[in-house]
From Swiss-Prot:
Region: Complementarity-determining-3, residue numbers: 88-96
Protein's GO biological process: adaptive immune response; immune response
Protein name (database record): Ig kappa chain V-VI region SAPC 10
Region spans: Framework-2: 34-48
Disulfide partners: C23-C87
Species name: Mus musculus (Mouse)
Amino acid sequence: EIVLTQSPAITAASLGQKVTITCSASSSVSYMHWYQQKSGTSPKPWIYEISKLASGVPARFSGSGSGTSYSLTISSMEAEDAAIYYCQQWNYPLITFGGGTKLEIKR
């Protein structure tokens, strides 16, 4: 089983600040996907196949990486970006998720 470790577990960013969330895999993976979850809702697909934005995702989001190291970046934090973000990989037949990164607004 491939283990995904996200860093940081919790972070706070000011509006307009650049934010980077990392996801480290215990073994090399071909693709990494990211989900966004807001309180009381199910996780939504956010970035798929490393860098492709899901429908409706703002262009300030981007994804990158290869091998065992991947990241999600927000170029300029907005209030609506406060959420929990999860990385996810599929190594047949197992799907694994990272532990999540809670992103809050720094006030």
